[in-house]
C-alpha cells in the first residue's frame, strides 16, 4: 500500500519504524477510540468532569492517529505523541 512520503522520511530519520499492518490492530484502536468518545459524551453534562472529558477526547484522537499509522505500516518509536499527531 502506498503511504505518504512523509512517513518514509520519518522512517529514514529513525522517528518511525516500518511494520506489517494488521487490520485487527486497526479495528481494535478504532473500538478503543469509540469507547473514549462514549465516555467523553457521558462527561459532557457534568462540568466537574471537564478535565476527564478533555483527556478522554485526546486519548481517543490519539487512538485514531495510531490506527492510521498502523494502516500505513508505520509505528512511532520514541518520537512521542506530538510527532505522530502532526
Regions found by a protein language model. Give the residues of each.
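Terminal alpha-helical segments
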Residues: 1-86
Amino acid at each position: 500500500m502506498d503511504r505518504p512520503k512523509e512517513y518514509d522520511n520519518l522512517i529514514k530519520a529513525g522517528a518511525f519504524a516500518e511494520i506489517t499492518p494488521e487490520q485487527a490492530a486497526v479495528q481494535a484502536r478504532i473500538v478503543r477510540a469509540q469507547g473514549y468518545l462514549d465516555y467523553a459524551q457521558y462527561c459532557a453534562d457534568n462540568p466537574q468532569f471537564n478535565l476527564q472529558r478533555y483527556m478522554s477526547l485526546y486519548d481517543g484522537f490519539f487512538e485514531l492517529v495510531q490506527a492510521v499509522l498502523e494502516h500505513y505500516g508505520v509505528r512511532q518509536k520514541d518520537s512521542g505523541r506530538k510527532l505522530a499527531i502532526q
